[in-house]
């Protein structure tokens, strides 16, 4: 699993002109899944992201987590993160989970996130989404599980 974790001032996901997920101050997480991913990977990723200390404390140090700042969490599935771009001029997606497995993994991630973090929103697996964000910092991390 590959995730792009972004600290945002605000973010939203639109599908066909309708907003389906929106947060203010918090984290936008783009998620790409591999065939080897499991529920254990998802639990580990979610725990790390929610508790990752990337928000500033009163002295300006990155010392607070999403939980500490009571921020929003916006989860967006993005299979293109798994693209193999090493050869040629067209990406290969052979490293990505199948659509069925990817949907199952994303649904599991969303269910777990909603149970452990009240302000959780999401995009829609398989949809053509427009993602809008104001990256805060910018603070962006690439995490692999």
Swiss-Prot record:
- Report which reactions are catalysed by this protein: glycyl-tRNA(Ala) + H2O = tRNA(Ala) + glycine + H(+); a D-aminoacyl-tRNA + H2O = a tRNA + a D-alpha-amino acid + H(+)
One GO CC term on file: cytoplasm
One Pfam short name: Tyr_Deacylase
Which keywords, in A-to-Z order, does the entry hold? Answer: Cytoplasm, Hydrolase, RNA-binding, tRNA-binding
Instruction: Name the domain of life this protein comes from.
Output: Bacteria
- The leader peptide range reads none
Whether tRNA-binding counts among this entry's keywords is: yes
InterPro entries the UniProt entry points to: Daa-tRNA_deacyls_DTD, DTD-like_sf
Compartment(s) where it occurs, according to its Swiss-Prot or TrEMBL record: Cytoplasm
Q: Which family does it belong to?
A: Belongs to the DTD family.
What free text does the record give on domains?
A: A Gly-cisPro motif from one monomer fits into the active site of the other monomer to allow specific chiral rejection of L-amino acids.
The protein here is known as D-aminoacyl-tRNA deacylase
